[in-house]
Swiss-Prot record:
Catalyzes the ATP-dependent phosphorylation of L-homoserine to L-homoserine phosphate. The gene is thrB. It comes from Bacillus cereus (strain Q1). Its EC number is 2.7.1.39. This is Homoserine kinase. Pathway: Amino-acid biosynthesis; L-threonine biosynthesis; L-threonine from L-aspartate: step 4/5.
Amino acid sequence: MIPLSIRVPASTANVGPGFDSVGIALSLYLHVVVKEKADKWQVIHSFEDSIPTDDKNLIVSTACKVCPSLSPYIIEVTSNIPLTRGLGSSASAIVAGIELANQLGKLNLTTDQRVQIATNFEGHPDNVAASILGGTVIGALDGKNVSVVRIESKELGVISLIPNEELNTDESRSVLPDVFPFHEAVKASAISNVLVAALCQKKWKVVGEMMERDHFHEPYRLELVPLLPSIRKCAKEFGAYGTALSGAGPSIFILTPYEKRQEIAEQLARVFTSMKVCELEIDHRGITVNKEEHIGL
């Protein structure tokens, strides 16, 4: 019997000025394999000790909130998505938990329902929608209702610079202002509008320009990620379209011409030796489920 397995891609959020709205799925993955029924939930993993191995695990707790009547199982979790680095590790766990409930609880959730539920858990649609749908997503949460549009960006290459230091999302959000002046909001939203239009029309140079002109969050987070300006300068010199914080940071996200991504990554690795330079691709499939013959679980 082939066990039920779920694969969820990582994601980057914001892409500069698309704050809490624009997300892109990336080729790093969280894998969940359902082993067998058990008396209580057990999560097998090789992560740090602080990651729970019982029903307090984020994947399991999410699944149980979605389907409270869910029977416990032993599951095995592996992932190459770095934790607390701005690459959607918690969002991928939430998405995996929803799908775990969907499959084991036979809920038959639609894609729209999964996006809505995931957004309710996460508080914004960018990361979770990208992990569910793949590709590039633009989303909006208006009260309780979420709207998401997905677009293709297959001509783009992706590079991520990942530091050794963690940065908690709550800490990164704590430096943001509680109040945003009206004229600043108008300017910031106009830049975000052009970013989205350029993404839709595949005007990559304009995308690169707009993603480096954010006013919503990056100016306030520079103190937490001081290398961003120098990485941005070098990446542009090496031929990248644009550079931005990946989500809340501390990882840096770079968009490049697809055919130049390896060359640019190698050049950046020679300069920024204290960071892990990853040449990635945009994941266009989103969450995938191997559910062959798992009915007997």
